Amino acid sequence: MRLRIPRLLARWAAITVSISALLFFAAGTTHVSSLRSYLAVFSSLLLATMLTVDPDLAKERAHPEDTGVDDGLRFAARLLFLLTLTFAALSVGRLRHTFNVPTHARDGGLVAFAFSGALQAWAMVVNPFFSPTLRIQAERGHRVIADGPYRFIRHPGYLAMSISVLASTLAIGSWIALIPAGAFVLVIRRRAQLEGEFLRNSLSGYIAYARKVRGSYAG
């Protein structure tokens, strides 16, 4: 535990600094209130999630086993996420398009972003197998999870990610960033569909769970 906390804080700081540097560089300034507010919420959600997630899951997510099943979609999703943030920061900074998004919409976007972060954290806390790769974690006793948000919808993590990226564009104040954000949502939905098919074929009890919980972000 003594070693875990310093490493966790170092990783949190590295991610926060990296994302902040990306946004402020794209904006060309640090004097954009919507960016500062967004980064404050982003950093807080990230730290809260990292502190509450299961240590074994944190290790799995930090060093996932490479299965090659969906590498293309994972890469595309990460790229589109970064493009969305870059476009948004560029729009409100160097291009000065902040006025295109009303204040109440930016505030609503920030609230939606915080909600998505809470939903994502909830899913990760109740699901110790929340891995970024498609694989059955037999070495950790992989089983179907039907608690928390999984009682209401399959793939709540993907729903949270989609809300998060769409809300980020509004919270920062950019309409144009909805273009890469929309592409991100399409990629994530396809990824959720692939995961659903994979789990139906590979995880014992998942078919029965899918029959019981009809709601699915994968469609």
Segments from the language model and where they lie:
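Membrane-anchoring alpha-helices and their flanking helix-loop junctions
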Residues: 1-150, 159-219
